[in-house]
Amino acid sequence: MNYRNITLIFLLSALFGCDKFAGVKVTETFNIENTYSELYVSNAINVVISDTAEEVKVTTGENLLPNVIIEEKDDILDIRLKDGTYFFNSTVNIELPVNPNLTKLTLSNASDIEGDVNAEELTINLRNASDAKLKGYVKKLTLNLKDASGIKKNIINNRYGLSCDECAVSMKDASDAYIHCDGTIRIVKLSGASDLHYTGNAEIILTGSTSSSSDIKHDVL
C-alpha cells in the first residue's frame, strides 16, 4: 500500500469516524423556572415536551454536552449550541416539562419538537427544515413556516392532533402543515409548493397570495 492510499484511508476515517468524538451518551438535568412564554430551539436539537417531566433533561455525547446552552432570560427559554460547535452524526435530545404559559415557539436549523400544547394563543415559527409534531388545543393559532419546514401529520381519532378555533397561516418554500379546525383558517400567504392539510369544518378565508403550486386540502380521515 503506497503513501497516498494510507493518507486517503486516514482522511476517510477521520471524516466518517468523527462521531466517536462526541463521546458516549450521557444525560444531565437542569432546573429552570418554567415561567417563560417563548421557546427558541436551534442547531438541529430535538425537543420532547413531556407531561411527566419535572425538570429539563439533556441527552447527548459526553463531549458535546458542555456545548449545549439552555438559557432562560426574562420570558424566553433559548436552547442552542455554542457558536462553531459541530460533531459529525451526533444528536442532542432534550426533554422539557409542559409549560402552560407558552405563547411563541420558534425552531430553526433542522430542529424538531413533539408533545402536547394547550394555549389560548400560540405562534409557531419554523424555518430551515424544522419540524413540529404536536397535539392539543390552541384557541388562536398562528403558523409561520418556511424553508421546507412542517407541522407534521399526527392523527388522533380520525382528525389531526393539533386543534384550533382560529388559524392564521403563512407558508412558503415547500412547507407543509396538518391541523384540525372547526372555526376559521385565514390564509395570509401560501406559496412555493407548500400545502395546508386540515380536518374539521373550517371556513377558509383568503386574505393574501396563494400560488398555483400550493394547495389547501380538506382531508377526511
Residue ranges and their predicted role:
Residues 1-221:
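Intrinsically disordered, low-complexity terminal regions
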